Amino acid sequence: EKPYKKIFGEFEGRHAATSAESETGDVKYHLGFAATRNVGGRDVRVSLIPNPSHLEFANPVLQGVARARQTILGGDGERDEATVVPISIHGDAAFPGEGVVAETFNMSRLRGYRVGGTLHIIANNQVGFTTDPNDGRSTHYSSDLAKGFEVPIVHVNAEDANTCIRVMQLGVEYRAKFGKDFLVDLVGYRRHGHNETDEPAFTQPAMYTQIRSHPSPRELWGERLVKEGTLAADEIQKLDEEIAANYERIQSSSSASDGEGEGPGEAVKAQDEAATATL
């Protein structure tokens, strides 16, 4: 995971690299990142490619990166599709609205471009910046485009953490067995604005009246744990206070160069090296 020190530091303008070559002109949450995680005793390399404000443009780039790395890791010029699993996270308005999404799906099973399946997640907050779904698409579901490519689609309540985990496990198993794309429509909502300067109640007043009176996922999960007898209410409150205090401590001492992991420069460099090795 990306250390909180790095995240807080970048939001406050303290970047590890300050040279002109390192400036992207884009927002900080579009920067790439790479790190190694230990999962079940095995190291897994996780890379987030830079995804610019050109909506969905990163999708074909991700396919190329995945295919190149599959070739490198496969050895002897043979691709091993099990070594690299691409994951695309889409917006519910951008998914049907940007043509590059359909173009990338069309290449997904072509022998010159296939990567053995991509896991797609639509972060469906039921609003596209300030556009309601009925003004942004001609289909019922934001995921309907994928039906034309016979991609399995699962709609899941984003507030149900256990079900979300099970659905992703299903997607991983499907991809491993059939080598094809799998899509999860993660239906939730956006509690705050599109970005730091957007006040959503100006354009969606009725929607945000409901959202602001609705318990957060953390509150709902806490209520569930209390009901199940897993934790007591005072234990949850204590955890909340400890986490908030920890955030404050980290933020007060953060800089973008703190913590482990690689920033956008290293992530891009790694992708360049992968592409060069493949060529």
Give the ranges of each region predicted by the language model.
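Hydrophobic side chains in beta-strands
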Residues: 122-123, 186
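Conserved phosphate-handling catalytic cores of large alpha/beta enzymes
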Residues: 128-139, 147-193, 197, 201
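Short, internal active-site loops enriched in acidic
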Residues: 91-94, 189-191
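Flexible glycine-/small-residue-enriched beta->alpha junction loops
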Residues: 208-214
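Conserved internal helical-beta-strand scaffold that buttresses enzyme catalytic cores
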Residues: 1-87, 93-101, 105-118, 124-138, ...
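A mobile, often basic/glycine-rich helix-loop segment
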Residues: 203-205
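Active-site-proximal loop->helix
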Residues: 144
